[in-house]
Regions:
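RNA-binding basic/glycine-rich loop and surface signature characteristic of RAMP-family CRISPR effectors
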Residues: 1-143
Length: 143
């Protein structure tokens, strides 16, 4: 269906909260989570909407924006946009370190999922073998 595929890594410089749109008590939008893993995620539709909004706020031509992203919901025009966004998944997150500052934490499952996604896109080559990490343990890597 689509002619080209690409992976995009998003890096948040401030706290991000993608709400699931379901109210629970005081929290009006619980964090979006994948149904099958329970891991936090960003729905592709939310990312697409944010990118569309950025194009619009930068003064992008409305016709080009509609061709790229599709018409606004509720529009009389009904056609799909030229781009599609998949859901974003967490690869690593900053965690406060006892030695000062923050470190990036991840897990073998998150790394393996990223490897599979990049391999599907034809971008992954010769990944090193992931070391085994025992339950309740951690492994430090210095880059």
């Amino acid at each position: 269906m689509f002619e080209q595929k690409a992976a995009v890594f998003l890096y948040a410089v401030s706290p991000v909260h993608m709400g699931a749109g379901q109210a629970i008590g005081v929290i009006d939008h619980p964090i979006q989570r994948e149904r099958h893993t329970g891991h936090p995620c960003f729905a592709g539709s939310g990312i697409k909407g944010a990118v569309r909004h950025s194009f619009k706020s930068l003064g992008g031509d409305e016709n080009h924006i509609n061709r790229l992203f599709g018409p606004e919901s509720g529009s009389a025009e009904l056609h799909a946009g030229a781009v599609s966004f998949g859901d974003a998944q967490i690869v690593a997150l900053p965690v406060r370190s006892l030695k000062g500052g923050f470190v990036y934490a991840t897990c073998p499952q998150a790394i393996a999922r990223t490897q599979r996604l990049l391999a599907h896109l034809g971008l992954a080559r010769n990944w090193p073998t992931l070391p085994e990490v025992a339950q309740g343990s951690c492994l430090t890597v210095h880059a």
